[in-house]
A protein has these predicted regions:
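Structured aminoacyl-transfer and RNA-binding surfaces used for tRNA recognition/handling
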Residues: 1-168
Length: 168
């Protein structure tokens, strides 16, 4: 299923006047925060499109991205910092507890080709933070780690979080 779509992006450059030039360019200065797809066709294997019996809208907002933009830019007044989903109130309680338990500090570094010790620590914090959130939502929805299907996926996520935890 597919159809016409639209995306909402935020221009994070100092002047905010790139006029869409950074959209879909993988630039950290332009972040997609929302998309809308007006589902009305099925994409056929021959490249054509067949109308669907029912039309609907698929839309989604990146909560963490919106929080990151608002918090990192000080409500759109300061564009000097790099926007990161992890430098927000969404992840700070998790990272504070990880700091307490591990004795290591999260410093918001980005990994390089040959990461140094702090970059490895920060990657571990981000992986564990993401996985804790995934586990929390999944378990709250009634999914338990197990040996088959989605339960096995959850088990693998848990094991990966533990593996990264051991690096701290």
């Amino acid at each position: 299923p597919c159809g016409p779509c639209s995306e909402l992006h935020v221009d994070l450059t100092a002047n905010g006047d790139t006029k869409g030039g950074l959209v879909n360019s993988d630039s950290a200065d332009c972040i997609e925060i929302w998309n809308l797809v007006f589902i009305q066709y099925n994409a056929d294997t021959d490249g054509g499109f067949s109308p669907l019996a029912a039309k609907y809208v698929d839309t989604g907002m990146g909560f963490e991205r919106v929080a990151a933009i608002i918090q990192t830019t000080n409500n759109f007044s300061d564009f000097t910092k790099t926007v990161s989903n992890y430098d927000t109130d969404v992840f700070s309680p998790i990272f504070k507890e990880l700091e307490k338990q591990s004795g290591k500090k999260y410093k918001s570094t980005l990994p390089s080709i040959e990461p140094n010790e702090q970059q490895k620590i920060d990657v571990a914090f981000r992986v564990i933070g993401d996985h804790i959130r995934t586990l929390s939502f999944s378990i709250a929805d009634g999914i338990q780690p197990g040996n088959t299907d989605r339960n096995y996926v959850l088990r693998r996520i848990l094991r990966r979080a533990v593996r990264y935890g051991r690096t701290l």
